Amino acid sequence: MQLTEQQQDKLSKVQLEESWKRSLTSFLLSPYMDSLRDFLFQQKQAQKTIYPPSKQIFNALNITPLDHVKVVILGQDPYHGPNQANGLSFSVQRGVALPPSLRNIFHELHTDLGVPVSRHGDLTKWAEQGVLLLNSVLTVEAGQPTSHHKQGWEEFTDAVIDVLNEQREHIVFILWGAYAQRKGQRINREKHLVLTAAHPSPLAANRGGFFGCKVFSKTNQYLKQHGIEPIDWQLDA
C-alpha cells in the first residue's frame, strides 16, 4: 500500500505498536478513525475526563504485539471510576480495590488451577505473556458507562479481531457474556478455539454459567496441544 505524505503523517501520530500499525493501516486511515479522532478531540475540548489516560488507550495492543498473541480476553469498555482503567480489559491499576468482576475471575482461576487469589488487579503480566486483554471500546467518560459506544471503537476492534482471525492460527478467544459472544461470531472456529461462558459480573455469574467454566485450564491445554507455551496465570504479589 503506497501512502501519501499526508497519510504517513497521520499514521506517525498514532501511538500504536508497529506490527499492529502495519496490519491496521487501512483502518487507521479510514473515515471511522477520522470520526473517532474528532469525537475524542471534542470531548477533550469540552474538558471531559476520559479513561484510561491517553498514553494507555492502546495498552493492550502495545504490550501484546500481533505475533505474540496466544489468547484474547474480550471485554466491553473501560472502568469509568478514577484510577481504575489501565487500557487492559478487566484489569485495574495497582492499589485500586478489585472490581467485582475481577474478583470473580480470580475466584474461578483459583478453583480451576489452584492459583492463589491476587491482592492486586493489574493484569499486565498476562498481557506480557501473550494474553490480549482487549475491550471492544477503548475509552469512556468518567462516571458514564458506555458513553463512547458507537463512535468508531467497535469497528476498530472488529478490525483487530479480523487481523488475528486471518493472519494467525491456534489463538484462544475467551468470550464472557452475550456482548463478547456476538462480537466473536466473526472468528473462524476451525483455526482458533473459542471458549464461551456467562459474564463474570456478580449479576450474571450468580445466575450460573461462569463459575466452573474452567477457561484457564482449557486454554493452557489447547496451547500445549499445539506446541505453544502455556500461560502462567499467577500474578506477582
UniProtKB/Swiss-Prot annotation:
Database matches in CDD domains: UDG-F1-like
Top-level enzyme category: hydrolase
Gene Ontology cellular-component terms listed: cytoplasm
Compartments where located: Cytoplasm
Swiss-Prot/TrEMBL catalytic activity: Hydrolyzes single-stranded DNA or mismatched double-stranded DNA and polynucleotides, releasing free uracil
GO biological process: base-excision repair, AP site formation via deaminated base removal
Pfam families: UDG
PROSITE patterns: U_DNA_GLYCOSYLASE
Sample GO molecular function, one term: uracil DNA N-glycosylase activity
SUPFAM superfamilies tied to this protein: Uracil-DNA glycosylase-like (SSF52141)
EC number: 3.2.2.27
Top-level taxon of origin: Bacteria
KW DNA damage (keyword) present: yes
Keywords for the protein's UniProt record, in alphabetical order: Cytoplasm, DNA damage, DNA repair, Hydrolase
Principal subcellular localization: cytoplasm
Active site: D77 (proton acceptor)
Family from the record: Belongs to the uracil-DNA glycosylase (UDG) superfamily. UNG family.
Job of this protein: Excises uracil residues from the DNA which can arise as a result of misincorporation of dUMP residues by DNA polymerase or due to deamination of cytosine.
NCBIfam families: PRK05254.1-1, PRK05254.1-2, PRK05254.1-4, PRK05254.1-5, ung
Entry protein name: Uracil-DNA glycosylase
Biological source species: Acinetobacter baumannii (strain SDF)
Gene that encodes it: ung
